[in-house]
From Swiss-Prot:
In larvae, expressed in the CNS and midgut but not in the ring gland, thoracic perisymapthetic organs (tPSO) or abdominal perisymapthetic organs (aPSO) (at protein level). In adults, expressed in brain and thoracic-abdominal ganglion but not in corpora cardiaca and corpora allata (at protein level). May act as a neurotransmitter or neuromodulator. Transmembrane segments: none annotated. This is Allatostatin-A3.
Amino acid sequence: VERYAFGL
């Protein structure tokens, strides 16, 4: 999902 797209 987009939450993990940044790898934060």
